[in-house]
Structures are given as structure tokens and as C-alpha cells.
């Protein structure tokens, strides 16, 4: 029995700025069958919030709890390790996911 689905996004549900055929059909089927699903992505160029906005614009209805991004996983890990100060070597937009940390080049506890 299938308990849940975990989907990659880029190339599976969309390419470039276009939703792929059948993307919403599978999600509607999963909702009808009450099978939970989540999305994962290794995209580090956009903060999670902007990525969700992009997906919604494309027609893929995604809420925050359904998306696990590489940046979000990094944030969760750093919080679990009780890191307070980090240096970010990321695109400017992606840095928004790390807003709860003290961002500093001086004596960082982690470099992302």
C-alpha cells in the first residue's frame, strides 16, 4: 500500500517556466485518494517563499508545508545544530531563507 509520494519538481512537474502535461492530474488523483504528497528540490537560487509563488503562478497549487527545498533543509539542520552565526555564499535572493541567523563573515559557526 502506498502511504505517500515525494516528488522532485524541476523536470518532473515543470520545465523552465512551463507546467508539464499531467502535473495537476496526478495531484488531483492523489487528493481524491487522500494520499499525502510533498515536493523536494535542490534549487538553491530562489528562497522557498519565491519558489512557492512561482509554482502557484505556473498553476501548481503548493503550500509551504508541502515544499522541502535545499535551503530549507539547510536551515533546519543549522537550527538543530544550534548554529547562530553563519556566512552565506549564496545568491542574494536565496539568503532570505536564512533570515533567522546572524549573518557574518567574522567567526561564523557554519558556511553555507
Q: Where are the regions that the model predicts?
A:
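HAD-like aspartate-dependent phosphatase fold
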Residues: 1-9, 13-112
Amino acid at each position: 500500500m502506498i502511504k505517500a509520494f515525494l516528488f522532485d519538481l524541476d523536470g518532473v512537474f515543470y520545465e523552465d517556466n512551463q507546467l508539464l502535461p499531467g502535473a495537476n492530474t496526478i495531484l488531483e488523483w492523489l487528493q481524491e485518494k487522500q494520499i499525502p504528497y510533498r515536493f523536494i528540490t535542490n534549487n538553491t537560487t530562489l528562497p522557498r517563499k519565491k519558489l512557492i509563488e512561482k509554482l502557484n503562478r505556473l498553476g501548481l497549487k503548493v503550500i509551504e508545508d508541502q515544499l522541502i527545498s535545499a535551503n530549507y533543509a539547510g536551515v533546519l539542520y543549522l537550527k538543530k545544530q544550534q548554529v547562530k552565526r553563519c556566512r552565506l555564499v549564496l545568491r542574494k535572493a536565496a539568503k532570505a531563507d536564512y533570515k533567522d541567523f546572524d549573518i557574518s563573515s567574522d567567526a561564523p559557526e557554519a558556511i553555507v
